Swiss-Prot record:
Residues in the signal sequence: 1-20
Keyword Manganese set for record: no
Protein's recorded name: Multidrug resistance protein MdtE
Organism: Escherichia coli (strain K12)
Pfam families: CusB_dom_1 (PF00529), HlyD_D23 (PF16576)
MF terms (GO), sorted A to Z: bile acid transmembrane transporter activity; identical protein binding
Entry annotated with the keyword Transport: yes
Key words of the record: Antibiotic resistance, Cell inner membrane, Cell membrane, Lipoprotein, Membrane, Palmitate, Signal, Transport
Length: 385
């Protein structure tokens, strides 16, 4: 009996040792399983923003030219200042124009007097014709002279009106409200009516236009995707945002105004025009900007962070996923385009897949890994294209 007890004790001790070793091996194996960050894919929609180059264009431009000739005797604005519609910009010497008006008024008075005498003569001839004291020829001559005199009155009145207008044109005014540019003439300069060179340019900059260029390929792609339902366009006006040359986002949001129906043969692009509020004058004509045009919402999209997509030697896109057994699997995928810092995946992955986005250097296909949630799980749904 004692002999059996002596044999049983060592066997129990060995069993306990083996159990402890198994537990320690399991702990070591768990400790050696690499941790990876994963993103669980779910379909959603994203706002597609087309990034288009463009330049700012004044909302209105008025090149000021004189409508009468004469000597500039005064400039009534400060270059670079705001001018209102109707403000006086230049004063042309009115004396010659006033003399022309006075002469026209004198000619009108003379024409009126001649017409009055012709009317009296005609009336007298008409009365005498009834009693046959004058001939029909004398009557006809009197009527013709009256008609000519009345026509001369009409011409003289028109001359007075034109001279009055010319005198008003001596005060050169701004037809729009805007910012004045550099004056091309000084006091004492001789100007002529409708000359080729403008005196000054006035530009309205609030609001302001931005002319954008879009390639025909992108234009056709957008139309196809809208027609197929892949993109749901924004109802009403299309919002547009601007990035300035210094990299900063312009504070005001604009809207798309129109799309040019023709294609520029030299560049193969179409022109889009957006309009922006410019209350502080931050946008100046000719500035280069980058516009973000909201094309609409792309439906049922799988977005994969760029960290989760690599390209093999053949240039094909691949991704590592963690299957239901926590085994790393390699998938060949189709990443149609990058939107911001994410790829739009059209095949090779499906909703619910866990894509590995961090810890990639510690794993390879076929091994087990332990998943941890990635901070990129909730990716932005507004992206550039």
């Amino acid at each position: 009996m004692n002999r059996r007890r002596k044999l049983l004790i060592p066997l129990l001790f060995c069993g306990a040792m083996l159990t402890a070793c198994d537990d320690k091996s399991a702990e070591n194996a768990a400790a050696m399983t690499p941790e990876v960050g994963v993103v669980t894919l779910s379909p959603g929609s994203v706002n597609v923003l087309s990034e288009l180059p463009g330049r700012t264009v004044p909302y209105e431009v008025a090149e000021i030219r004189p409508q009468v000739g004469g000597i500039i005797i005064k400039r009534n604005f400060i270059e670079g200042d705001k001018v209102n519609q109707g403000d006086s910009l230049y004063q042309i010497d009115p004396a010659p124009l006033q003399a022309e008006l006075n002469s026209a008024k004198g000619s009108l008075a003379k024409a009126l007097s001649t017409a009055s005498n012709a009317r009296i003569t005609f009336n007298r001839q008409a009365s005498l014709l009834k009693t046959n004291y004058v001939s029909r020829q004398d009557y006809d001559t009197a009527r013709t002279q009256l008609n000519e005199a009345e026509a001369n009155v009409t011409v003289a009145k028109a001359a007075v009106e034109q001279a009055t207008i010319n005198l008003q044109y001596a005060n050169v005014t701004s037809p729009i409200t805007g910012v004045s540019g550099k004056s091309s003439v000084t006091v004492g300069a001789l100007v002529t009516a409708n000359q080729a060179d403008s005196l000054v340019t006035v530009q309205r900059l609030d609001p302001i236009y931005v002319d954008l260029t879009q390639s025909v390929q992108d234009f056709l792609r957008m139309k196809e995707e809208v027609a197929s339902g892949q993109i749901k366009q924004v109802q009403g006006s299309t919002p547009v945002q601007l990035n300035l040359e210094n990299g900063k986002r312009y504070s005001q949001t604009g809207t798309l105004k129109f799309s040019d129906p023709t294609v520029d043969e030299t560049t193969g692009s179409v022109t889009l025009r957006a309009i922006f509020p410019n209350p502080n004058g931050d946008l100046l004509p000719g500035m280069y900007v980058t516009a973000l045009v909201d094309e609409g919402s792309r439906q049922n999209v799988l977005l994969v962070p760029q960290e989760g997509v690599t390209h093999n030697a053949q240039g094909k896109a691949t991704a590592l996923i963690l299957d239901k057994d926590d085994v790393v699997q390699l998938r060949e995928i189709e990443a149609s385009k990058a939107i911001g810092d994410q790829w739009v995946v059209t095949s090779g992955l499906q909703a619910g897949d866990r894509v590995i986005v961090s810890g990639l250097q510690r794993i390879r296909p076929g091994i087990k890994a332990r998943a941890i949630s990635s901070s990129q799980e909730n990716a932005s749904t507004e992206s550039k294209q």
